Amino acid sequence: MFSRRLSIGLLCVALSAGILAVPAAAASKGRILVYSGSTGYRHESIPAAVEALKAIGAKAGYTVDASEDPEVFSAEKLKQYQVLVLVSNSTDPKKPESEWFTDSRRDALQGFLKDGKGVIGLHAAADSHYNWPWYGQMIGGYFERHPKGTPKGTLTVVDAKHPATAKLPKTIERNDEWYYYKDFNPTMRVLVTIDPASIGDGEPDVNPNPLVWCHDFGGGRVFYSALGHTPESYSEPYMVNLLTGALAYAASK
């Protein structure tokens, strides 16, 4: 008993004197905002996407906040974040009033990029804010249509030097909802494409169709991926690796 008390006493003295180093909790690299509010078609994959991004961000050392309140888009609130992820934040193209990026919120998003920060758009982030051309330029294009259902298609990595594609296989077959775009900016750095002929169902052979791309825009970095219509997508190693690299890219200076 005396020996145990002596050991505890010596430990307390050592700690108070700073003799023993106690590892501190790792400091966060910064904050990521995941926004998934939608006023158009609501994707059932949104909860899975948010949870996956929380896990991926935390593993990379970031604090991840999630919101569906458009009031988060103020200059004051956005300044605490390094990366903004827009998860299937669709609006109704037939209802301009469904768009929440208006006035000061537009200024806040533009200021966010101007400060050298990063934006990631996922899936229906391209199906949003059709009445704000700057938004479409930021994303790289607008959703136009997709084949019926979630058919299997063949994806090809065309640029493996990007962090988002560095760990992906050269080609893969997977199921998803495959987007085609209008007003696509051909100057995008395209990372992944799909062969429309591989989808079948009479899809026109417009080869190749871009699915994942990035570019420098407005003073910051923007990454977009069309993948992720289904909840199951976000547990696939392919998607986890893609999103891990996308966050690294968006957070880089």
Residue ranges and their predicted role:
Residues M1-L11:
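Bacterial N-terminal signal peptides that target proteins for export
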Residues G9-I19:
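Bacterial N-terminal signal peptides
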Residues A21-P23:
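N-terminal signal peptide c-region/cleavage motif recognized by signal peptidases
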Residues A26-G30, S36, E44-P47, E51-Y62, ...:
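Extracellular ligand-binding/catalytic regions of CAZymes and related secreted enzymes
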Residues I32-Y35, L78-H129, G219:
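Short alpha-beta junction capping motif
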